[in-house]
Amino acid sequence: MINKIENWDKVEANYGEGKRLTAGGYICKILAVVKEKSKAGKEMLVVNFDIAEGDFKDYYMERYKNATRDNNNPVEPKWKGKYYLLLEGDGYEGRLKAFITSVEESNSNYSWDWNEDSLKEKLFGAIFREEEYIYNGEVRTNCKVWQTRSVKKIRDNDFELPRKKELPEEEKAKINAPFVDTFQPITEEDLPF
């Protein structure tokens, strides 16, 4: 017989699913910034970050560690805390300026010098929203950075929570479409021999 756990009634059940990030405002810390090309061939900055404070502190590091520990997964785990900023195309300047301004306002004595390496270890505020996607034939939800703000605005709760980004109904209908059986029996006359 095993020993009874003293605070058994207060223990929270852990089903191995881990904490799920929810929509809201978070204080984030930049771990690295890399200049890359998008799938469309456009220049972009990839901001690798993690959550720096609160209930979800180190959220992406924990996910990465857990994925690394999974010996049954042959795929190399990917860092999930990423924010993409295009450096060309329509309207990219405003989004880049919003991000840089958020970083400058969140880090005293920091001034952007056009060197992406200078962003490392800096804080910024991020507003995450829920986004739907399809995985293995089912609609799932994930949270991603929608916009950036200063750390102060996040701490003061001075932002609006965005609506969930839902998939178009026609995309959802494709995965819920009934299976149509197009099987036609083959007779001996249909055989090539």
Language-model segments: residues:
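Short beta-rich binding modules
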Residues: M1-F193
